[in-house]
Amino acid sequence: MTNIRKTHPLIKIINHSFIDLPAPSNISAWWNFGSLLGICLIIQILTGLFLAMHYTSDTMTAFSSVTHICRDVNYGWLIRYMHANGASMFFICLFLHVGRGLYYGSYTYFETWNIGVILLFAVMATAFMGYVLPWGQMSFWGATVITNLLSAIPYIGTTLVEWIWGGFSVDKATLTRFFAFHFILPFIITALVMVHLLFLHETGSNNPSGLISDSDKIPFHPYYTIKDILGILLLILVLMILVLFSPDLLGDPDNYTPANPLNTPPHIKPEWYFLFAYAILRSIPNKLGGVLALVLSILILMLFPILHMSKQRSMMFRPLSQCMFWILVADLFTLTWIGGQPVEYPFIIIGQLASILYFMIILLILPAISLFENKLLKW
């Protein structure tokens, strides 16, 4: 009798993706983040679904409905904080996943990589709109500031902003549509994830050495299923420690004040995972220039396959490139810190220098070092 796992039209797809998938024998823990992101997405969709059952997307009742969830709904506080901190875990995994791709040259699978960058944009858009929903002070002013950036687009800017707002300011119409988009986007993300995996399984996984591993493959199950389960348990452990011991650690106290259009908070800043991009935005004195830099700071990831000058794929055997990679990581930490600071000396100049360094490392220094390493190896 033939195995149903290998013959059934639906189960067969799952089999080829998660069970009999040939995987390189030497992929490290850095390859765990794909599955962890999948788990994060599932957690976010499930907790979000239960929150949506009790949330009302109306300016008069949104803030109260979130309070009601935390106080009156059974385990509502748990669902709410799992959703809020789940977003932070999502972005930690995302940044590590992208960083792994940069370090080991996974961007040479350019279809997979480009879908990944689109996914990053989609997740960032979803997180931004989700942050607006509790309708606290930072929700309202964050939405006002970020949507207002679109007015920098020449000719159509102002019309575009008013069209997105559904009026002349962030109001009831804006909140309702943000809730609608925040609800639908995770399902679009799920579809994109499937495309991401489809492209990945066309080529197979990369590995730390960056060499072709066709001659040494092992089945995904049981080797990598058990490894993924360990990663998932650690992810849930960290998430639950965050949720149960310090749920507000990564949030902003201003968001516990209901939105008030007549009172601007002293420091408007987004959630921690957007601070690096926010710092790049603020480091340019011109509005349109800042918006372009903001978009390019993420879009620049799509240039990595073109900017790859080395004859080797991975950075595993390239110490000079490794050094530059870690300087880039340190630079991103610096930008994240600056994004949370007020706009005054010395933070302004530090932010500007860190922004220049960010683009210089990616566009000039890394490709130049790669060419130099080729020369050193007489390639």
From Swiss-Prot:
Residues at which a ubiquinone binds: 201
Q: How does it sit in the membrane?
A: Multi-pass membrane protein
Q: Which GO terms describe its cellular component?
A: mitochondrial inner membrane; respiratory chain complex III
Q: Biological process GO annotation list?
A: mitochondrial electron transport, ubiquinol to cytochrome c
Can you tell me where the transmembrane regions are? 33-53, 77-98, 113-133, 178-198, 226-246, 288-308, 320-340, 347-367
Pfam families listed in its UniProt record:
Cytochrom_B_C, Cytochrome_B
Entries under InterPro entries matching the protein: Cyt_b/b6_C, Cyt_b/b6_C_sf, Cyt_b/b6_N, Cytb/b6-like_sf, Cytochrome_b, Cytochrome_b_C_euk/bac, Cytochrome_b_N_euk/bac, Di-haem_cyt_TM
Main localization category:
mitochondrion
Q: Which residues bind heme b b562?
A: 83, 182
Disulfide pattern: none
Cofactor binding note from Swiss-Prot or TrEMBL: Binds 2 heme b groups non-covalently.
State the remark under miscellaneous.
Heme 1 (or BL or b562) is low-potential and absorbs at about 562 nm, and heme 2 (or BH or b566) is high-potential and absorbs at about 566 nm.
* Role description: Component of the ubiquinol-cytochrome c reductase complex (complex III or cytochrome b-c1 complex) that is part of the mitochondrial respiratory chain. The b-c1 complex mediates electron transfer from ubiquinol to cytochrome c. Contributes to the generation of a proton gradient across the mitochondrial membrane that is then used for ATP synthesis.
Q: How does it assemble?
A: The cytochrome bc1 complex contains 11 subunits: 3 respiratory subunits (MT-CYB, CYC1 and UQCRFS1), 2 core proteins (UQCRC1 and UQCRC2) and 6 low-molecular weight proteins (UQCRH/QCR6, UQCRB/QCR7, UQCRQ/QCR8, UQCR10/QCR9, UQCR11/QCR10 and a cleavage product of UQCRFS1). This cytochrome bc1 complex then forms a dimer.
Family label: Belongs to the cytochrome b family.
Quote the protein name from its UniProt record: Cytochrome b
Name the species this protein comes from.
Tamias canipes
Biological classification of the source = Eukaryota, Metazoa, Chordata, Craniata, Vertebrata
Q: Which gene is transcribed and translated to give this protein?
A: MT-CYB
